[in-house]
């Protein structure tokens, strides 16, 4: 049974506050989602307008409202502005399973912030969303994301051939999983 509340949960770590993203955050979302390097493996073209950022925020809100997932804005405690996001989507409640996604402004790469945020949401997902399995689908050339999930205990299960059609082409994706039993052990 899902113990998550109707209110959007705010999570705190040593350096971060993970919170709901609102339309007030559109400029910050646009700033990093318009960066080609950030969007390289995101499945979308770099954003060209603020309306695309507002559409992304609307998608985040629909995940939570429809109980299909949740997406947190990643903020530094002392700043408050959104520097990335992370969360769950494609939640399948009857199978206690979801997919994880994350991205971070390039300015903050290599500082351990994504790992800190993802550790917090995994703990939340296992405890309050009663997840048993979290999947990560990652393009083979995206080595930094592969290393990150491997450090967090995810296991690569295989290659999903031509699994996604994005940016006018089919992409292979590695499928990784983290089970609640992996975390407990």
Regions found by a protein language model. Give the residues of each.
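Conserved GNAT-fold acetyl-CoA-binding loop/helix
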Residues: 37-59
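A generic alpha-helix structural signal
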Residues: 30, 54-57, 61, 122
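Acyl-donor (CoA/ACP) binding surface of acyl/acetyltransferases
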Residues: 1-28, 32-36, 71, 75-185
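Generic hydrophobic, helix-prone segments enriched in Leu/Val/Ile
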Residues: 5-8, 47, 64-65
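A short helix-loop-beta-strand connector motif used in the catalytic cores of GNAT acetyltransferases and
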Residues: 60-73
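Hydrophobic residues in alpha-helical segments
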Residues: 33, 42, 64-65
